[in-house]
Amino acid sequence: MNQLEHLKDEEEEEESVCSREDVIRNNINRFKAVCPGAGEHPLQYNYTFWYSRRTPSRPANTQSYEQNIRQISTVASVEQFWKFYSHLVRPGDLTGHSDFHLFKEGIKPMWEDEANRSGGKWIIRLRKGLASRFWENIILAMLGEQFMVGEEICGVVVSIRFQEDILSIWNKTASDHTTTSRIRDTLRRVLNLPPNTIMEYKTHNDSIKDNSSFRNTKITL
């Protein structure tokens, strides 16, 4: 059991899990924290949770996306993470066209953000019912610095859709094939993916060109 999981058990004794989506919008500011408290275990980076939801029938653009995405909390320590996360609705309980994002503080989960502009993302499509477990596993891998690619990781996203759910991890430099390959291989390991799992990569520049997150991707095994 690693440090993140051990401290999770301690927090769960004190905090009850909220199962309502309303927690995202109502009275959420009381969770905000930007520096570790006394005696807490600091994360290597501060991380910010974001939430977005939109109507699929409406075409997406930069302005509407920025209006729909909401910053909900920033955490700086292992303890702060578990305290907030234990109140957060699980992705599998979200409805409609919704996304949770967890990014390094200061990086917006937008293709156009300076930290993301030259980057891209790995995409894993999940059948319904798996999103909550995979989301937690990829978060713990990122917070625990398991990817071993320096400052390349920007954040992770879980996207809830009607027919499938999608997990993605964003990195800064799409042209660095050594780094993107290492991220892919680490994803396979930490998520315990079968060898024949299809993984897709898409640069943010391509997403800007075709105004889509998950179409026209490059597929790899």
Give residue ranges: language-model regions.
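Core residues of folded domains in eukaryotic genome-function proteins
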Residues: 43-47, 68-71, 118-122, 152-154, ...
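Short active-site loop/helix that positions an aromatic residue
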Residues: 80-90
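Glycine-rich loop/turn
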Residues: 44-72
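Long, polar low-complexity intrinsically disordered regions
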Residues: 1-44, 177, 191-194, 208-221
